[in-house]
């Protein structure tokens, strides 16, 4: 009888140990790299798709493996950015992430993988990279990707005597457009500058200009402007002025040169342009590595994580 009880007790202990060990397992393992429930949950919260979340884990494992192979680690600058982004995300969404089982450290871990890709980009193609992308190529791509301009903006909406927003009449719109068109011609002829045109326009509406216009930059897809705005500005020669209507606004603008070293625009956007040019090459390296890594999925733990976000 005692032997039967002892065997039963041993069985309970074994089952208990197995359950405890399982609950402390990993939902996704890729090669030698294991991803916690919190890390998987954070990936899932971003992708909203379990297959894409697993794909991210594969990329992250490949990122770490490639960094190990090359003997590099995350730079102090990227570590600082990771810490700042983690603090920002946690300050806004801590409650949500705690509810789905994500800790602040989980976010740090995932962001560290993300910036690991940028570290690899710098290692291969950056300023001191193995296959550095020339400054000439960076400048050319920047000039193709962005346009700079100085603009005088006026609205087709005004306040009525009742304090309500109303659209300008057709005659008012025509008068405004003709005024801008006339000044654009004067700019293109060299009679006045865009800043002088700005002074003339503001004086006509009772305002005083105290400083020169700043150069604004935009690219395709910029949500601040209509879809066609970028292409309309890009068609202009540098230094050319034109009138562009966009939504409820009308612009008298002049395209600017933005690749001069003294302005610093190319340097400011260098990382973004390098990523546009070469991140796909880094991703290809990672895909080649991840294709040869064994992926193990704990369906039970994955399901637990997924149900919390359902």
Regions found by a protein language model. Give the residues of each.
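PPIase-associated folding chaperone regions across multiple families
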Residues: 30, 48, 101-175, 224-310
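Alpha-helical transmembrane segments
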Residues: 8-15
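Peptidyl-prolyl cis-trans isomerase
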Residues: 178-227, 264
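Positively charged n-region of N-terminal signal peptides that target proteins for export
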Residues: 1-8
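N-terminal targeting/tethering segments
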Residues: 21-111
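Cross-family detector of peptidyl-prolyl cis-trans isomerase
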Residues: 23, 31-37, 169, 181-182, ...
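Solvent-exposed loop/turn and edge beta-strand elements of beta-rich ligand-binding domains
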Residues: 3, 28-36, 42, 177-184, ...
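C-terminal motif of bacterial Sec signal peptides marking the signal peptidase cleavage site
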Residues: 16-20
């Amino acid at each position: 009888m005692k032997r039967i009880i002892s065997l039963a007790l041993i069985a309970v202990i074994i089952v208990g140990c197995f359950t405890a060990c399982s609950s402390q397992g990993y939902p996704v393992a890729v090669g030698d790299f294991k991803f916690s429930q919190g890390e998987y949950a954070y990936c899932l919260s971003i992708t909203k798709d379990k297959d894409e979340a697993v794909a991210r884990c594969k990329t992250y494992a490949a990122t770490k493996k490639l960094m190990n192979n090359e003997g590099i680690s995350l730079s102090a600058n990227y570590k600082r950015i990771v810490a700042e982004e983690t603090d920002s995300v946690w300050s806004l969404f801590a409650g949500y992430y705690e509810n789905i089982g994500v800790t602040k450290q989980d976010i740090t871990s995932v962001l560290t993988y993300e910036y690991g890709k940028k570290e690899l980009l710098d290692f291969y193609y950056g300023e001191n990279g193995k296959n550095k992308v020339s400054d000439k190529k960076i400048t050319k791509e920047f000039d193709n990707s962005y346009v700079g301009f100085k603009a005088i903006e006026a609205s087709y909406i005004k306040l009525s005597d009742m304090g309500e927003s109303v659209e300008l009449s057709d005659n008012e719109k025509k008068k405004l457009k003709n005024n801008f068109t006339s000044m654009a011609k004067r700019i293109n002829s060299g009679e006045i500058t865009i800043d002088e045109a700005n002074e003339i326009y503001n004086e006509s509406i009772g305002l005083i200009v105290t400083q020169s216009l700043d150069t604004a930059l935009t690219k395709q897809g910029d949500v601040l402007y209509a879809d066609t705005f970028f292409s309309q500005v890009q068609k202009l020669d540098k230094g050319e002025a034109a009138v562009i209507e966009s939504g409820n606004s009308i612009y008298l603008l002049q395209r600017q040169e933005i690749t001069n070293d003294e302005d610093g625009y190319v340097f400011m956007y260098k990382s973004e342009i390098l990523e546009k040019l070469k991140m796909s090459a880094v991703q290809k390296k990672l895909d080649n590595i991840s294709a040869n890594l064994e992926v193990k999925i704990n369906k039970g733990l994955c399901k637990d994580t997924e149900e919390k976000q359902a």
